[in-house]
Amino acid sequence: MAQMKTPGVYIQEKNAFSTSVVEAATAIPAFIGITEKAVNGSESLANKPWKITSMTEFVQYFGGAPKPVFNLSIATDSNDALYCKEIVEGQYFKVSNPSALYTLYYNMVMFFANGGGTCYIVSVGTYKKGKIDNDNIKLALDSLKKIREVTLIVVPEAVNTAKETCKNIQTDVIMHCGEMQNRFAIFDVHPKEKDEDSMSQQIEDFQTGIGSNYLSYGAAYYPYLNTSVISDKDIDGTVLRWETAPKLESVFGENSKLQKYLDDCFKIEEGKEITDTARNNAHSALLINWDEYKNAANKVKEYLNLLPPSAAMAGIYAMVDNTRGVWKAPANVSLNYVNSPTETISDLEQEDLNMPMNGKAINAIRTFPGEGIKVWGARTLDGNSQDWRYINVRRTMLFIEESVKNAAKAYVFEPNISNTWLNMKSMIGSFLNGVWKQGGLAGSVPEDAYSVQVGLGETMTQDDVLNGIMRITVLVAITRPAEFIEITFQQQVQKS
């Protein structure tokens, strides 16, 4: 207030309300992976977290889908084949995929299709020269330390790497979440390396690889999903490459008309490459006239539509948070753009996933007749912990901690006296009361749902005050999901 030296009227404003707690964000994921590009105009976005809100913005800054190439050939063996059919004895119609598989674009489609919104993208490389490895992921995680708004970490392409690399990436991610103490990791289980590998071996390998540190800061989902991101029109002659198409008499047999058509399609001048138009014309002819080619095209589509569930689950987290609140378990929810899970999990099999001896629970995605495909699990990897067994409990606590922490910064260097303690207690109590009214805390009255303690002789000693320390204790009763519902029926004697 100005000093009163000149006669006149002076205005003094006083705050009528105390400082309030602003709710922290709860479902802002950061996706780390390979993109077509990473630019904003002339600015490079490589290894730089960039905020987007839609698939349109993703394409604007990070480009479109990859252009996979599948080679079709006539071979004398069936090794390394995505699709293989013996046409005549000793000769195989074979489809192989020699190019690296980049899936972040498709995973982002799944994220937005399942309720996702605002998120961050960290591009660690491009399709031409990028790869997912431990060093790239560590650099990306370091860049995310500066973005406190991020609350979920997802690396959907980790499972495209070798099993050992995937293990190291996942342990780095969960360590990052535990050290930051404001974010949660969503994991996938590495796919089978051989068809004969069992589901139990897959799960055991993941549980062994994830380690034992900060397990409450992550959750895993199983199995892979057969999605509908890729349609028939996305599979054309530029995807299915058949450079030996002009000479396939042994395959087509009597179908000389088709052979002649292909010869015309691929008639090129010496020294020039086959055009995409020629490839697409041949592709259309083969689809109509040869069932084996159509089967191969469908197999390629199925292969590209096979995606891990983590990105879709990030969308589910965002949708549930926005509609019900972070305290609602992200389970018993249907998945969009999913035709089926790759494995059919029975009740008996889920027992070992949901409640393993080591506590490292894996949340199942299951098909229920007449209901659809649902997320059927809500546990963290710390399933043996009474405190942090459930995803919504861990994430609700992160939400409360981050919100209160941000609000408490306003009181740093304030006098460590009773008035300050009272203001702090009132501010935190008001925030928790709002959470309780929304259903985030359990209790019929506020006193049963939470309590805030601060003050000399209550949470602090005289030494604490002398050393500039203010200690606050907050007790909360977070709601827990009804994971098991038991209904008892008993007959009673007729009364009239």
Residue ranges and their predicted role:
Residues 132-133, 162-164:
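Active-site-adjacent loop/helix micro-motif of nuclease/hydrolase catalytic cores
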Residues 1-118, 139, 145-159, 165, ...:
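Structured, hydrophobic secondary-structure cores that serve as assembly/anchoring elements
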Residues 125-142:
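A short, well-structured beta->alpha microelement
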Residues 170-173:
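Extracytoplasmic, non-cytosolic globular domains
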